Amino acid sequence: MKGAPHMAEKLTPREKGFSEWYVDLVQKAKLADYSDVKGCMVIRPNGYALWENMQRVLDKMFKDLGHKNAYFPLLIPESYLKKEAEHVEGFNPQLAVVTHAGGSKLEEPYVIRPTSETIINRSFAKWIQSYRDLPLLLNQWANVMRWEMRTRLFLRTTEFLWQEGHTCHETEEDAEKETRQMLEVYRTFAEDYMAMPVMTGQKSESERFAGALRTYSIEAMMQDKKALQAGTSHNLGQNFAKAFDTQFQGRDGKMHHVWQTSWGVSTRLIGGLIMTHSDDAGLIVPPKLAATHVVIIPIFGKASDAEKAQVLEKTNALAADLRKAGLGVVLDDDDTKSPGFKYNEHELIGTCLRIELGPKDLAKNSCVMVRRDVRQKEFVSLDEAVSKAQAMLDAMQKDLFTKAKSFRDSHTFEVNSYEELKEKADQGFLLAHWNLDPKVEARIKEETGLTTRCRPFDLKQEPGKCVVTGEPSPGRIVFSKAY
């Protein structure tokens, strides 16, 4: 075809370089790009569409549980962060500070939001007077900034998009219930929508959020067997409430500090989705989060003008029927591109299902359907095209989860000695006994590159001996190399 574009660029194979494959995919699938601002990325429309769908699902899940959206300032007075000593110490190396504005030096510097516990507590202290004002359940969709030295698109950037939930409660029990409930929301979202199996559990003291009593996380395994912390939920206790004097008059008539939680997920989830499912041909997106479910590609070959018109009429009608069924559809009738180019292009950008239709298919009242994940042709009657497309997308969603879970489970091991831990350091999730000593944890990280991920809730915990020191251990914790 004269003037036709060349075949889509190939990605670095995962086996040759997983990191290079990932960067290739993100850029060539037009998900994100580098910017001239150090450590900051440009999220392109293909990537932002994924984030919008994640937002849509999560926002409904939050609101169904009674949370309401609000928005707080990007700039936080530096003194606010200093009110909670552990919090400012934990974030200090990552802070971006504004010292000048309007042509002059500020009396007090502002910190660009790394997270919003401090400034939100300032408002909570004004809004909450009585136990009748509780629980207070808020969520914020925002951008945050944490100065990162080593960045990677979606996974670790200086500026990123996220949601952060902030809640206040009467009792410690209520706060703990909320913390665990929101972790379960994240697990449900990761598994039911992202088709990404996760372990849920409690983080170690060194991995705990600065200023929290306890931190819980969801941990996923990527195809290179590294862990990705995909979401966190924190029981803040009364630490921030005491720092900002966030009190309420209780049912006993006395003043009490509120009990608080915070929880969040970010655009890092997009990186997790990519590394869980995608292949050497490009992006694979679980249908529940896809912006485009179906691409219809007319196949003309040596068809006459009349035959082309018939094919286009049918493909337009089919596209309309699929859209009525609630699917995102693209009709790719660009005659400057060959069918082969279009196949590669839509595999690269992660379109879930391809439908091919030419004059010969039309004569048989059939079409060809190809699922993105298995890439096998299936001949389908046009009378059943809509129901078959929906069934294939449902099957794809389930199969992606099953495949990812099988991969994770086959790379999860119990280890019973330090030698075994070191030998299996690159093999996935390692369940090992540890004595809870942060110094031992730091030694393991330095000598093996392994970090503690979480103490899984669904693992029956039995006492044992620390694999490093032989000292008593209350149970096994997941060690893994991680992003």
UniProtKB/Swiss-Prot annotation:
SMART domains assigned: ProRS-C_1
Keywords: Aminoacyl-tRNA synthetase, ATP-binding, Cytoplasm, Ligase, Nucleotide-binding, Protein biosynthesis
Cellular component GO terms held in the UniProt record: aminoacyl-tRNA synthetase multienzyme complex; cytoplasm
EC identifiers of the protein: 6.1.1.15
Keyword Transcription on entry: no
Localization: Cytoplasm
Catalysed transformations (reactions): tRNA(Pro) + L-proline + ATP = L-prolyl-tRNA(Pro) + AMP + diphosphate
SUPFAM superfamilies linked: C-terminal domain of ProRS, Class II aaRS ABD-related, Class II aaRS and biotin synthetases
GO annotation terms (biological process): prolyl-tRNA aminoacylation
InterPro entries: aa-tRNA-synt_IIb, aa-tRNA-synth_II, aa-tRNA-synth_II/BPL/LPL, Anticodon-bd, Anticodon-bd_dom_sf, Pro-tRNA-ligase_IIa, Pro-tRNA-ligase_IIa_arc-type, Pro-tRNA_ligase_II_C
Matches recorded under CDD domains: ProRS_anticodon_zinc (cd00862), ProRS_core_arch_euk (cd00778)
GO MF term list: ATP binding; proline-tRNA ligase activity
PROSITE patterns in the record: AA_TRNA_LIGASE_II (PS50862)
Subunit structure: Homodimer.
Function: Catalyzes the attachment of proline to tRNA(Pro) in a two-step reaction: proline is first activated by ATP to form Pro-AMP and then transferred to the acceptor end of tRNA(Pro).
Family that this chain belongs to: Belongs to the class-II aminoacyl-tRNA synthetase family. ProS type 3 subfamily.
NCBIfam families: proS_fam_I
Free-text comment on this protein's domains from its UniProt entry: Consists of three domains: the N-terminal catalytic domain, the anticodon-binding domain and the C-terminal extension.
Record's protein name: Proline--tRNA ligase
Source organism per UniProt: Myxococcus xanthus (strain DK1622)
